[in-house]
């Protein structure tokens, strides 16, 4: 454990599961190195459970009220903008109260506040902390390459790369190799100008932060991290994989679906590297037709699988029953769960492939466990992640087409797991990447984490 100089870090995760988990995992890594933690969190259904965390954590609810119908929508730009607008004043009030308590009764407050550590999506939080004279560190839970897209987004819109047009989708983006136009970050469900404005605010707040922390492998994204460091002129740290740097621990929000651990017992009875794990994360959704195609693609492939069908995965339906005829085809070789302990599933020796939406957390976890991927990005940064996985690192294969189709699904599974030369090459490269990731934990990520603790203790 690193020596602590006393005081605490105020940690404020963004209330989406894919953002929340890495920030809380990072907080646990800092805590293990002697840093006191106070968690600010949105109140209500998206609050963390204190029982899941060390006894000396402190939890401070921040009332953030956004219309439920907006939160239930897929308009990411509007949701994030509304959350920031609703959060700024109550966050400032609670941080001010904590600062006053720390000045008056350090025992009650747990020591003085050294800094705020928050998701870069909370641009209002970064600005409010700075306004109160508190150093603020931003955490990027996506890749460094995605942050580089954030930085260039307004230019990409102004130059006509976005919105994506059919006739240009395969064109190279000269300003951002290795991206093609169709790989660029985007959300079809929100207004492009509003999204560009949001990213502009995120970058502006990040430039004025006291430092940026990326959940990424330093050895994979070294060049991109260097470009960001030079352009932003703030300290930059890379800490990944957090699932290897920090002991396994629960990090979840009230109201999230609990993981079904029964699938692990089922995996125990399967042959090594024979099972395909299928999960599209905590937010991606698909149309009912695609769900049917995916079910039949898995059935037709004839390979054992664990499939996560979470509530609200299928647009317009709260849950998903297998289509008629599929259950009989997959009985005994397919397990469907509402949620899975993903890190443990990917680490299981029976798992030989991961059919994924290519969210960044899932990508990091797959690389850290050496599990090759079948990629079908759905929105946001997933297109760019798939570009790196399949065409730069070459540790995965893509399902052809914009919509899931059973024949293309079966073909992708056969390419990866059917003993082909392509599949063997993918597995070999993924194993090499895993070895490099394991080596980099101590050499790079661990040292960046140590340097981050030193920075925090210097405040």
Curated annotation (Swiss-Prot):
Optimum temperature is 45 degrees Celsius. PROSITE patterns: UDPGT (PS00375). Its cofactor is Mg(2+); Ca(2+). SUPFAM superfamilies: UDP-Glycosyltransferase/glycogen phosphorylase. Its EC number is 2.4.1.202. The active site is at residues 19, 119. UDP-alpha-D-glucose binds at residues 141, 340, 342, 357, 360-362, 365, 381-382. Glucosyltransferase involved in the last step of benzoxazinoid glucoside biosynthesis. Catalyzes the glucosylation of hydroxamic acids utilizing UDP-glucose as glucose doner, reducing the toxicity of these natural insecticides for storage. Can use DIMBOA and DIBOA as substrates, HMBOA (2-hydroxy-7-methoxy-2H-1,4-benzoxazin-3(4H)-one) and HBOA (2-hydroxy-2H-1,4-benzoxazin-3(4H)-one) with a lower efficiency, but not indole acetic acid or quercitin. This is DIMBOA UDP-glucosyltransferase BX8. It comes from Zea mays.
């Amino acid at each position: 454990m690193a020596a602590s100089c006393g005081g605490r870090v105020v940690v404020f995760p963004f209330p989406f599961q894919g953002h929340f988990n890495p920030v809380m995992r990072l907080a646990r890594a800092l805590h293990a190195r002697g840093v006191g933690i106070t968690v600010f969190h949105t109140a209500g259904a998206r609050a963390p459970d204190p029982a899941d965390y060390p006894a000396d954590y402190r939890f401070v609810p921040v009332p953030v009220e956004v219309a439920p119908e907006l939160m239930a929508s897929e308009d990411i730009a509007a949701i994030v903008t509304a959350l920031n607008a609703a959060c700024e004043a109550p966050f400032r009030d609670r941080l001010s109260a904590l600062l006053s308590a720390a000045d008056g009764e350090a025992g009650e407050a747990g020591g003085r506040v050294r800094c705020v550590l928050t998701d870069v999506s909370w641009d209002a939080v970064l600005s409010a902390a700075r306004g109160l004279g508190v150093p603020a560190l931003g955490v990027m839970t996506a890749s460094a390459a995605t942050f580089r897209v954030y930085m260039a987004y307004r230019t990409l819109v102004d130059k006509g790369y976005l919105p994506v047009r059919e006739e240009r989708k395969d064109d190279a983006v000269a300003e951002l190799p290795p991206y093609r136009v169709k790989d660029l970050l985007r959300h079809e469900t929100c207004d492009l100008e509003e999204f560009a404005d949001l990213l502009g605010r995120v970058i502006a707040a990040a430039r004025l932060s006291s430092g940026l922390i990326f959940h990424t492998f330093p050895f994979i994204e070294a060049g991109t991290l260097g470009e960001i460091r030079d352009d932003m002129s703030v300290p930059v740290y890379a800490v990944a994989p957090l699932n290897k740097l920090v002991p396994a621990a629960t990090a979840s929000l009230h109201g999230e679906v609990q993981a079904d651990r029964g699938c692990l017992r089922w995996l125990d009875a399967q042959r090594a590297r024979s099972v395909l794990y299928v999960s599209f994360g905590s937010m991606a959704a698909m149309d009912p037709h695609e769900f049917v195609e995916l079910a039949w693609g898995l059935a037709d492939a004839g390979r054992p699988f664990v499939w996560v069908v979470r509530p609200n995965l299928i647009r317009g339906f709260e849950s998903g029953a297998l289509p008629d005829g599929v259950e009989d085809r997959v009985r005994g070789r397919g397990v469907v769960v509402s949620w899975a302990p993903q890190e443990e599933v990917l680490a299981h020796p029976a798992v030989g492939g991961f059919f994924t939406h290519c969210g960044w957390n899932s990508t990091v976890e797959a690389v850290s466990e050496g599990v090759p991927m079948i990629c079908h990005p759905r929105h946001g940064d997933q297109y760019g992640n798939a570009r790196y996985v399949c065409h730069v690192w070459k540790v995965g294969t893509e399902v052809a087409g914009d919509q899931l189709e059973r024949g293309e699904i079966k073909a992708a599974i056969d390419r990866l797991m059917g003993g082909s030369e392509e599949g063997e090459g993918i597995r070999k490269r993924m194993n090499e990447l895993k070895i490099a990731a394991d080596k980099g934990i101590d050499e790079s990520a661990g040292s960046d984490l140590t340097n981050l603790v030193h920075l925090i203790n210097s405040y």
